Regions:
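C-terminal and inter-domain tail/linker signature
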Residues: 1-140
Length: 140
């Protein structure tokens, strides 16, 4: 893995896991495009990323993310990750349940001039809802 990309991933994951909103946001370009498949439309700008992070941390104050795998080139990274947390605040209009969740997902991140220009997240919303006991286990 390229040293610059390796440093980015290490610093980025550390910022997420220490809940350093300023450090996470600093990795995003001011005009970035942030796409989360669970949302109806993309978000634009580093401030929208900051608001999203604060929203997640209010809902899951013990939020932690593990980078399971990464495939990278000079300016792109495909990341497979798992995040965990305890549902202590309203999330997606779901009142706090106090339940622990484990969510798996992937991100495709594009860097430009050392900043995230575009991020696309695809994650297991059904798994989150199952952990919150709002969706039954799938059988068969």
């Amino acid at each position: 893995m390229d040293t610059k990309m390796s440093e980015f991933l290490n610093e980025f994951m550390t910022a997420w896991n220490t809940h350093d909103v300023r450090a996470v946001t600093a990795w995003y370009a001011a005009d970035c495009e942030d796409i989360d498949v669970a949302r109806t439309r993309p978000q634009y700008g580093a401030d929208s990323v900051r608001r999203t992070l604060v929203y997640y941390l209010r809902a899951f104050p013990d939020f932690q993310v593990t980078l399971n795998d990464a495939v990278v080139d000079d300016e792109r990274a495909a990341l497979y990750w798992t995040w965990t947390g305890t549902h202590r605040g309203t999330f997606m209009n779901i009142p706090p349940t106090g339940r622990r969740v484990t969510v798996r997902g992937s991100s495709l991140v594009t860097l430009k001039d050392g900043k995230i220009q575009r991020a696309v997240r695809i994650w297991d919303l059904a798994g989150l809802l199952r952990d919150l006991k709002l969706l039954p286990e799938l059988t068969g």
